[in-house]
């Protein structure tokens, strides 16, 4: 496990544009992924994650161009996810300049795909994204289930068991998003993050719910995550990545400044 904990801004890209508003001061065009990625690079982000939320295959080529463009100008690791369904998709993204590729629903429909991708390209560049919702009634032991389609469709798969299975199949990292917390700005689901982190040996990236800098710190100290991912806290200019790192350092968390 790396000692320094990572901060990863996340950008949703739709048809080649960053969506979920980005409000940087003095950025010419807040919708341009290259501009936004460069700004995060300058702020000291450890990595950047692009999630392509473009629905149609016709527009899929656009994300490839975005990745090529960003990779040519930004030199921190780049993870790309969204619509990755085949070995060819993984190869295309890696060839375009992505360092890692995140596999989400395709892993659920075909777990062997994860193993094949890891065997083909190496575990270090395969991230499995886990979208989980708490399903246990109040007062009962915590239980989370995997949901697909943006948290609308349940699968009946236990999130913690799934995380262990993905590790066994070779995944290099797990991106764990709480669908309950996503967009709430009320902090990570720390119990979910911690339970998965403590169940696997590979790094876990905490995602979903960051509203303030202390939430990022909690993801590491209480959630036992190796990295924390956030979107709007950075996009809306509330905080810079540097401020987040300083807050983490104050908490005794080792970061790369």
Swiss-Prot record:
Pfam family, one: His_biosynth
Function: IGPS catalyzes the conversion of PRFAR and glutamine to IGP, AICAR and glutamate. The HisF subunit catalyzes the cyclization activity that produces IGP and AICAR from PRFAR using the ammonia provided by the HisH subunit.
Superkingdom as given in the UniProt entry: Bacteria
TM region positions: none
UniProt pathway annotation: Amino-acid biosynthesis; L-histidine biosynthesis; L-histidine from 5-phospho-alpha-D-ribose 1-diphosphate: step 5/9
UniProt subcellular location: Cytoplasm
Example GO molecular function: imidazoleglycerol-phosphate synthase activity
Quaternary structure (record): Heterodimer of HisH and HisF.
Keyword Amino-acid biosynthesis: yes
The entry's keywords: Amino-acid biosynthesis, Cytoplasm, Histidine biosynthesis, Lyase
Catalyzed reactions: 5-[(5-phospho-1-deoxy-D-ribulos-1-ylimino)methylamino]-1-(5-phospho-beta-D-ribosyl)imidazole-4-carboxamide + L-glutamine = D-erythro-1-(imidazol-4-yl)glycerol 3-phosphate + 5-amino-1-(5-phospho-beta-D-ribosyl)imidazole-4-carboxamide + L-glutamate + H(+)
Protein's organism: Hydrogenovibrio crunogenus (strain DSM 25203 / XCL-2)
Any one GO biological process: L-histidine biosynthetic process
Catalytic center residues: 12, 131
Annotated family: Belongs to the HisA/HisF family.
Name listed for the protein in its UniProt record: Imidazole glycerol phosphate synthase subunit HisF
Gene Ontology, cellular component aspect: cytoplasm
EC number: 4.3.2.10
């Amino acid at each position: 496990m790396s000692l320094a904990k990572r901060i990863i801004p996340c950008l949703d890209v739709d048809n080649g544009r960053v969506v979920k508003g980005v409000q940087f001061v003095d950025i010419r065009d807040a919708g341009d992924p290259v501009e936004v990625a460069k700004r995060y690079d300058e702020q000291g982000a450890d990595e950047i994650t692009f999630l392509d939320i473009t629905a149609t295959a016709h527009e899929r080529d656009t994300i490839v161009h975005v990745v090529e463009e960003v990779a040519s100008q930004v030199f921190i690791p780049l993870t790309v996810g969204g619509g990755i369904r085949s070995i060819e998709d993984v190869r295309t993204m890696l060839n375009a300049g992505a360092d890692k590729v995140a596999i989400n629903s395709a892993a659920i429909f075909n777990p062997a795909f994860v193993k094949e991708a890891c065997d083909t390209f190496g575990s270090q560049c395969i991230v499995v994204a886990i979208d989980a919702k708490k399903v246990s009634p109040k007062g009962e032991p915590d239980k989370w289930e995997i949901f697909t389609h943006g948290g609308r469709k349940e699968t009946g798969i236990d999130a913690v068991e799934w995380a262990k299975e993905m590790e066994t199949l070779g995944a290099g990292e797990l991106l764990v998003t709480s669908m309950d917390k996503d967009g709430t700005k009320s902090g990570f689901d720390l119990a979910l993050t911690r339970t998965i982190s403590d169940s696997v040996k590979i790094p876990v990236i905490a995602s979903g719910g960051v509203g303030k800098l202390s939430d990022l710190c909690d993801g590491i100290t209480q959630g036992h995550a190796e990295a924390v991912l956030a979107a709007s806290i950075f996009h809306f200019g509330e905080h810079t990545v540097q401020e987040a790192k300083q807050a983490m350092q104050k908490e005794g968390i080792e970061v790369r400044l």
